Amino acid sequence: MGLALAFKCANQGLSVILLESGGFGDRGNAEARLGSAEILTPHHAALEAIRCQGIGGTSRLWGGRCVALDDIDFEKRDHVANSGWPIPHAEIANYYGEALTFLGCGIDAAHAKNAERTAQAEIATDMPEYWSAEPDLRRQHGARLRNSANIRVYTLCTVSGIRLDSDGARVAALVVKSGDRSFEVTARSYVLAGGGLENARLLLLAQRDWPHKFGGPNGPLGRYYCGHLSGYLAAIRFNQQSFAKSLWYRKSSDGSHLRHRLAPSPDAQRKHALLNTVFWLDSFSIGDPAHGSGALSMLYLGLALLGLYPRIGNGLAPSPTEPRSRGLRRHLSNVVRDPRLLSSMFSVTWQFSKRRLGQRAFALMNPGERYLLRYHAEQVPTSESRVFLADDDRGGTPKLCVDFRFQPQDIDSVVKSHEVLDDWLQREKIGRLDYLTDADRQSEAVLNQALDGYHQIGVTRMADDPKSGVVDRDCRVHDMANLFVAGSSVFPTAGQANPTLPAVALALRLGDHLRRIASTL
């Protein structure tokens, strides 16, 4: 987010100082310079998996998926506590094209109008996601950053504190550490863009000196921490391959990739009290005979016989079934029972050869018309899910404690969303779901797969009322004249989308706001 914002401001004639804890090189050791954290829940990813120092930040860990939020995400929903944004979706959507271009999704994606879920259909089938051709933003924009006349980059410089002026109404300076040195940086406006956890840590540290700032000790700062639930609860079997193909990866005219997903409509969400959820197709691993395809089993057996599968085949796609159910006999059964084996083998071999030669490696379409169904679901924001500073200040920087919680509503909504989708598939004679878990264990299966910490949403949430949020509709910290926050930590709700695209769009919007107010600060 910081890189997008820096370019936006610089292109409009503003002078920018970019403070980066890492450098231009390979991924740094975040723990060495950033503060430590204690994860209090098994449902939150480890710090080394979610933090990355260096130009481009966590884009080095990012897969490249770009997805827009939906209009319903911005509504106050009766069945979703603490929902509603103070701005409409259009305020962000106006910047999606520019954000897609910055993220490397190609010209076609940048000019595409985001599809809206129709109220008439219970399940939408045209929800697009775009893929960046180069997710690592350091590689995309590093040279441009070095050559920018309006951006001064200071690497290996970690912001360790925020110093306010005498009445606490403005930021006077940022406290910066670089190696053994400590110094201050001053500017007219300051933007925290260090990721949700680090943004929250810096504000919580400032709150220790100013206890009534940012909503006070029991206010919204650090609370409403949420992300997404993702995993597999079912496979999907189609009655015809053409429908699966409409949901599969394809190239646009400029060479970028996109695909479409399945999603309950806004009316269906309201009717069934669902959190926003989407589904997409994944291939079974070719080593898992649960795919039901003789051609995929033949490909696996051939690679295994030649000793190549462990090197180039293993991990082509996920496999949620038990290893003991993946024996040779089941693969041979797939081969014998496949009436379209020869034609399917040609298709699979062609896909596999393209997959190995292409720049981006996507999974294989299944001639057996059975796919894993991946869900990606919203988490309800709750104040009990939070981050806070430990009382122990050992090491100089207080440890950040992460108490990230899923709620029963989150789990129930995932299960119910599958039921709504299955009813629609069968009613429309499109296909059906094959559950991977017995009905009485489905909630347990969803909870066991529930893990986030990558998206870091809500801990500096946006609201018009300082009692309900940390920043206002312009991403300015309440009661602070010149302090702003960029990133998904300002989202009041998570929606179904991974937050990269809307967070960049919101950062670009902030850049325009900073230009408008530059002469007043």
Language-model features: where?
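N-terminal Rossmann-fold NAD(P) dinucleotide-binding loop
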Residues: 2-3
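N-terminal FAD cofactor-binding segment of flavoenzymes
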Residues: 8-69, 87-103
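Glycine-rich loop(s) and the adjacent beta-strand/alpha-helix scaffold that form part
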Residues: 11, 22-25, 45-48, 162, ...
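A generic secondary-structure signal for well-formed alpha-helical elements
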Residues: 13-16, 23-29, 69, 96-107, ...
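Short, solvent-exposed loop/turn and secondary-structure capping segments
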Residues: 27-31, 58, 64, 73-74, ...
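Conserved redox-cofactor binding core of oxidoreductases
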Residues: 42, 47, 78-173, 447-449
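A glycine-rich dinucleotide-binding beta-alpha-beta segment and adjacent secondary-structure elements
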Residues: 154-167, 351-385, 397-494, 500
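Mid-to-C-terminal "cap/lid" subdomains and adjacent gly/pro-rich loops that border
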Residues: 193, 201-367, 519
